[in-house]
Amino acid sequence: MSALNKLFGDERKRDLESNVAALFSQSSGPVDTLEVKSKPRTLLPVVSKRQETETAKPAEPTEIVEADLPRKRAKKAKKTNEDDDHLEEKYMQQVLKEDSDHESEAEAPTEPVVELKPSKRASRPDMKEEELAKAERTVFVGNVPHEAITDKKVYKEFKQLVAQRKLSKEDEDDEEQKAEKYAVESIRFRSIAFEEALPRKVAFVQQKLHHTRDSVNAYVVYAEKEAVTAACKLNGSVFHDHHLRFDSVAHPAPHDRKRSVFVGNLDFEESEESLWKHFMSCGPIEYVRIVRDPKTNVGKGFAYVQFADLVSVNKALLLNDKKMAVGKGRKLRVTRCRNMQKVQRQSNTAALPKLTDQQKTKLGRARKVLGKADRATLGKLTIEGTRATKGANTPNLRVKKARSKTGRVTKRSQAFKKAEANKKQK
């Protein structure tokens, strides 16, 4: 073969050359750039990573997949059947849970957040509510004999008189049964006249009473409000030759000018008992009131007498310009009472804080019922928790001034005490 190849050449080489020649003979010539640009661009399909991984995994045998499918379907069907069995129970539990959540939200509403500020002391106007409640249980007793403040025996008798027994239907039927009496909290005596211008406590301890004034006034405070009505029925009763006048402090009896007479030209030292006896012949008397000076408790020379009916007034007018059979024996001037308009005091409401309608009502009532000391602090602001301070006394009251520490009297007393101490040492 090698010899033949050398003579005639290699066949493979000849075939290759012929093929190459045939390839270039079929060429279409040079490339046209315009034709290339006009051809559409070929786009390759995008392959995702998931497809790449799936293609990269070896294909599982179809027999195994076909064998696992019935098992999975059976498990899924069994699971759905179990879910269907417990579906109603789960639904009811969900409904109950939602109802309980709604109830808890309704019971405990969300409260708005409040910013806490530093606390301050509470302040409110002093309406004297305790004193007003005490006035509802207080009775005024006039023309009380002055022995009630000097003699303990007379005082006990007076206390037994005002402490009445409680009347009821059972007590009226059974007289042997002893009924309970109204409890008396306190008895205060006022309108006491003294002979010398001393402090009231000193003059009372020394018993320097005015010799011409034989009566005083008293305020009886009961433990129950019902006792006031029963005590007012004792009006006009006689106690140690004195006609007592009982009246409520909170709800006093109104002054009826048509049943009253004005008595003038009285002696300054005249007593209520002498007027009571003088007008007793005219008819039943409700009360006798002599107007007195608040500082000295001595009469101003005129009085008012109120009767129980209108007929007694005409009889009393016949005693005009006639001398009194008892007492000082002066001629009296008896006339009808005039309809005098009361001068209303201007209340200084500008200095008071802003009050409600209810507080204004209490303020006006307290001014008529309470005394001078309580009226001075009425309506003023009181700060809870504060204590009384020295010098914060009630205005318009008599206050004894403290003795000077550097005055002449103090120096003389100190020198006298030193001299007495030196004498004792010697």
From Swiss-Prot:
Localization in the cell: Nucleus, Nucleolus
PROSITE patterns in the cross-refs: RRM
GO molecular function: RNA binding; rRNA binding
Limits of the RRM domain: 137-251, 259-339
SUPFAM superfamilies linked to this entry: RNA-binding domain, RBD
Region (Disordered): 26-128, 401-426
CDD domains: RRM2_Nop12p_like (cd12670)
Job of this protein: Involved in pre-25S rRNA processing.
Protein name: Nucleolar protein 12
Upper lineage: Eukaryota, Fungi, Dikarya, Ascomycota, Saccharomycotina
